[in-house]
C-alpha cells in the first residue's frame, strides 16, 4: 500500500518474546543466525568519545526507519545505528518501486517515509526494544557486546534544518524522556518488570548531515556551524563521490571497473562541492569544533547520482542513485585522498559497498562507523552481517589479536614501518620516548596488548606515541588497501552483471516455490510464512431461485505447499525488493495474501486487495474477517455456529457445520464459497502466528 504504519509498542514486545519462545526467531530473523559477540573478542571502538561494541552499523536507510528494523540490525551484530535521515518535507510521493538490487544497487528514495514525529517515536521504540531484550537475559550476549550508539541524520538544507519540525526532532533525540515514559506505560502487563528499567533518554548527541546532491558548499558549512552552536552536536558531513572529480570518477568507474553504460551527468560534478571547496570547509569546521569542544568528521560516501538508463524505475525519474559494490572503490579512493591531505586528524565514517569480504578491510583502516545498506537487501537480509564477523574473526585469529586496535596495527604488516616513520619524525631516540617505541616494537614481535604496554611506560608521552603510531598505521593501511581494491575483479561489471534467476512462472495467491527469499530481503519484515495445512477443500456454489437455495456446482481448492507466503501491509512500502529476488514474476508484495493492521488502513487503501482480521473479546463470537478480492469487498462473521457472509451482491447466513441445508438470505446471482473458504483459512492461520498479538 506504499505507506508504512508504525506498530503498537506493546504488540512489538509481545511478538518479540512470543516468537522467540515458540519459533526461535524474532521478527522472522532465526535465532541461530543472531550475532551476539564472542567471548575473548573485543570489537569495541570509540565514536565521538563514546564506546560502541562494534564499528558495524546499518546505514541511514531502509534498515533504520522502523522500530523492528533497528532491533533486527542489532540482532545481526550492528552496534552504531545510523538512523534514517529526516527532513521537513515528510509527505513526499516516492516512486514505486524505489529500490533496484538486480545487479549493483540503485534507488530513487529520499529520506524518511514516516512523518518526522513518527520517526522520532520509532527510534525511541527501537532503542527500548533492544534494552528490554537485553534485560530479559534471553540472549547469550557476550560481556563486551552490549554497548550500542545511535547517530541521527537530518537534511537537506539550512532552512529545513532550522524549522520547528526538525528542531523538535533533534531536541527529542537529545532528551526523549517524555516519549520513553509514554511507551513505558505500554509495556504489556505480563512483562511489567521491564517498566522499571532505566531506559536511555538521551538517545543521541551525534549527527550525520545528509545534503542534496548539488548542495552549495557554503550551505553545508552553515548547516554544520548551526548544528554545532545551536544544538551542541558532534557532527559528521556525508560527502559525495563526485569529490574525486569528473576525470577520476569516470576513469575508475567506466574504464577500470568497466561500467561503461552508466553515465554520471556533468551536472553532478558542476553542482556538487569541489575537492578544493570541501578542504576549505573541513578545515574551518574542524577549528570550530575544536574551539567548542565538539567532535567533527566526514563520511565517505553518499550515493552516486547517475542517469536512469534502465527500465526498472518510472521513466519520469531522469536520474537515480547508485550504491553497492562498485561504490566501494570510489569510497576507498576518497578515504585515501582525504587522508593524504588531513592525515588522521578527522575521524572517517564509511558506507560504500560494504560486505562480508571487505568489512574486515574497512576495520583495518580505522573507519568508524562502517555502515551497510545494499548488502543487507540481498538474500539473507540482516543475517548476512554475521558473516562479516566470521571473516574478521578469521583474520584476527591468524594475527593472534583479540581487539580492534591490535588488529589495525597488524592487519597489513605496516606496523614496523609506521614505528620507523614516527621515530624519524621527532621522537627523542636517546630518551624515554625511545624506550616507549622499543617497548611497542617488542610487543609487536612477541605479542601482547599494545595500549596496555604504552600505558605501563614511565614516559608520560607513551600514550601519545601509541596514538601517533596507530594513526600512522591507518594511513599506511589505506595506501595498501587502495592499491589492492582498485584491481580486484569482484568490483567490476563482469562480476556484477548477472541478475537473480527467474524461472518464467507468475506468482499466484497460493503455492509459489516457497523458497523463502522474499522474507529476509524485506528490511521491514513485511513478508512472512503462513501455516495453512496442505490439502483439498471443497468449494460449493449456491443459487437462490423460486424453490429456494440449492447447490449448483462443486469445485475444489488444492494447496500443495507446507506453508504459504503472506504480506503485512502496514510494514510494506512496496519498495519492490522482494520482487527482485523472487524466482517467479509478479512480486510477493503485490500478489500474495495481504494483511492490514487495522480496519482503518484496510478501508483507506481500497485499491489493494487483502484481509483484516478484527479480534473480539468474547468466546461466543469469532473474529470478523474483512476482505477484498479483485477490488470487491466481503465480510465473514460468526456467532456460535451461525455464519454471516456478505459480498458485493449478497448477504447470507448459514450453519457452519451444514451450509448446504441451512443457507438463507439474499443474493442477486450465484454465490461461490471460494472466497469464504479462503477467508476462513486466513483467519485460522493468521491468528495462529506470533504476528497476531495485542498490545
Predicted regions and their residues:
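Glycine/Thr-rich beta-alpha phosphate-binding loop at enzyme active sites
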Residues: 25-39, 246-344, 379-393, 397
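C-terminal helical cap(s) of enzyme catalytic domains, especially alpha/beta-barrels
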Residues: 91-110, 315-317, 377-402
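Catalytic cores of alpha/beta
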Residues: 67-75, 222-225, 340, 354-372
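N-terminal capping/small domains of soluble enzymes
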Residues: 1-232, 677-685
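Ferredoxin-type iron-sulfur electron-transfer modules and their immediate structural context
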Residues: 398-401, 405-571
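Glycine-rich phosphate-binding active-site loops on the catalytic face of alpha/beta enzymes
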Residues: 77-90, 239-241, 361-391, 426-468, ...
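Glycine-rich beta-to-alpha transition loops that act as phosphate-gripper elements at the mouths
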Residues: 60-63, 304, 346-359
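Flanking helices and flexible, charged tails adjoining ferredoxin-like Fe-S electron-transfer domains
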Residues: 461, 467-470, 484-498, 537-693
Amino acid at each position: 500500500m506504499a505507506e508504512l504504519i508504525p506498530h503498537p509498542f506493546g504488540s512489538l514486545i509481545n511478538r518479540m518474546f512470543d516468537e522467540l519462545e515458540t519459533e526461535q526467531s524474532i521478527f522472522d530473523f532465526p535465532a541461530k543466525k543472531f550475532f551476539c559477540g564472542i567471548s575473548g573478542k573485543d570489537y569495541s571502538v570509540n565514536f565521538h568519545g563514546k564506546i560502541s561494541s562494534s564499528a558495524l552499523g546499518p546505514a541511514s536507510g531502509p534498515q533504520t526507519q522502523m522500530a523492528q528494523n533497528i532491533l533486527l540490525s542489532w540482532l545481526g551484530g550492528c552496534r552504531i545505528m545510523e538512523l534514517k535521515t529526516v527532513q521537513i518535507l515528510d509527505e513526499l510521493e516516492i516512486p514505486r518501486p524505489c529500490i533496484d538490487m538486480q545487479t549493483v544497487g540503485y534507488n530513487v528514495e529520499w529520506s524518511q517515509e514516516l512523518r518526522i514525529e513518527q520517526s522520532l517515536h520509532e527510534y525511541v521504540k527501537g532503542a527500548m526494544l533492544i534494552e528490554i531484550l537485553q534485560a530479559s537475559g534471553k540472549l547469550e550476549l557476550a560481556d563486551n557486546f552490549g554497548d550500542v550508539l545511535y547517530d541521527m541524520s537530518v537534511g537537506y538544507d539550512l532552512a529545513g534544518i532550522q524549522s520547528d519540525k526538525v528542531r523538535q526532532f533533534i531536541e527529542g533525540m537529545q532528551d526523549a524522556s517524555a516519549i520513553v515514559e509514554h511507551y513505558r506505560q505500554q509495556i504489556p502487563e505480563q512483562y511489567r518488570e521491564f517498566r522499571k528499567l532505566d531506559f536511555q533518554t538521551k538517545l543521541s548527541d551525534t549527527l550525520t548531515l545528509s545534503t542534496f546532491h548539488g548542495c552549495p558548499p557554503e550551505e553545508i558549512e552553515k548547516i554544520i556551524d548551526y548544528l554545532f552552536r545551536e544544538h551542541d552536536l558532534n557532527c559528521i558531513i556525508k560527502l559525495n563521490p563526485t569529490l574525486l572529480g569528473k576525470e577520476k570518477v569516470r576513469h575508475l568507474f567506466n574504464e577500470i571497473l568497466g561500467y561503461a553504460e552508466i553515465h554520471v551527468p556533468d551536472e553532478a560534478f558542476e553542482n556538487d562541492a569541489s575537492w578544493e571547496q570541501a578542504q576549505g570547509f573541513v578545515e574551518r569546521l574542524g577549528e570550530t569544533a575544536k574551539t567548542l569542544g565538539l567532535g567533527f568528521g566526514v563520511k565517505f560516501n553518499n550515493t552516486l547520482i547517475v542517469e536512469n538508463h534502465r527500465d526498472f524505475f518510472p521513466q519520469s525519474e531522469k536520474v537515480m542513485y547508485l550504491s553497492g559494490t562498485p561504490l566501494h572503490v570510489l569510497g576507498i579512493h576518497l578515504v585515501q585522498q582525504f587522508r593524504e591531505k588531513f592525515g588522521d586528524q578527522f575521524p572517517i565514517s564509511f558506507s560504500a559497498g560494504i560486505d562480508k569480504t571487505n568489512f574486515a578491510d574497512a576495520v583495518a583502516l580505522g573507519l568508524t562507523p562502517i555502515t551497510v545498506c545494499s548488502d543487507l537487501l540481498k538474500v539473507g537480509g540482516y543475517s548476512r552481517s554475521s558473516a562479516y564477523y566470521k571473516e574478521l574473526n578469521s583474520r584476527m585469529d591468524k594475527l593472534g589479536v583479540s581487539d580492534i586496535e591490535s588488529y589495525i596495527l597488524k592487519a597489513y604488516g605496516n606496523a614496523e614501518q609506521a614505528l620507523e616513520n614516527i621515530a624519524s619524525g621527532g621522537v627523542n631516540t636517546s630518551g624515554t620516548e625511545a624506550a616507549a617505541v622499543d617497548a611497542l616494537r617488542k610487543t609487536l614481535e612477541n605479542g601482547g596488548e599494545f595500549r596496555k604496554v604504552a600505558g605501563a611506560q614511565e614516559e608520560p608521552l607513551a600514550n601519545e606515541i601509541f596514538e601517533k603510531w596507530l594513526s600512522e598505521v591507518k594511513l599506511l593501511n589505506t595506501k595498501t588497501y587502495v592499491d589492492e581494491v582498485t584491481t580486484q575483479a569482484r568490483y567490476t561489471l563482469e562480476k556484477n552483471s548477472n541478475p537473480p534467476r527467474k524461472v518464467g512462472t507468475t506468482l499466484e495467491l497460493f503455492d509459489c516455490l516457497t523458497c523463502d527469499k522474499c522474507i529476509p530481503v524485506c528490511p521491514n519484515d513485511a513478508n512472512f510464512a503462513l501455516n495453512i495445512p496442505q490439502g483439498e477443500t471443497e468449494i460449493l456454489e449456491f443459487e437462490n431461485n423460486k424453490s429456494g437455495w440449492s447447490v449448483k456446482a462443486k469445485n475444489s481448492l488444492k494447496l500443495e505447499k507446507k506453508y504459504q507466503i503472506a504480506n503485512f501491509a502496514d510494514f510494506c512500502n512496496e519498495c519492490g525488493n522482494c520482487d527482485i529476488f523472487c524466482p517467479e514474476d509478479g512480486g510477493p508484495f503485490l500478489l500474495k495474501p495481504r494483511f492490514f493492521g487495522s480496519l482503518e488502513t484496510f478501508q483507506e487503501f481500497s485499491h489493494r486487495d487483502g484481509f483484516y482480521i478484527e479480534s473480539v473479546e468474547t468466546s461466543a463470537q469469532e473474529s470478523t474477517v474483512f476482505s477484498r478480492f479483485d477490488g470487491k469487498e466481503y465480510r465473514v462473521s460468526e456467532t456460535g455456529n451461525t455464519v454471516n457472509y456478505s459480498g458485493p451482491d449478497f448477504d447470507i447466513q448459514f450453519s457452519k457445520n451444514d451450509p448446504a441445508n441451512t443457507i438463507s438470505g439474499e443474493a442477486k446471482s450465484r454465490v461461490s464459497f471460494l472466497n469464504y473458504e479462503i477467508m476462513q483459512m486466513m483467519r485460522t492461520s493468521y491468528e495462529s502466528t506470533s504476528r497476531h498479538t495485542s498490545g
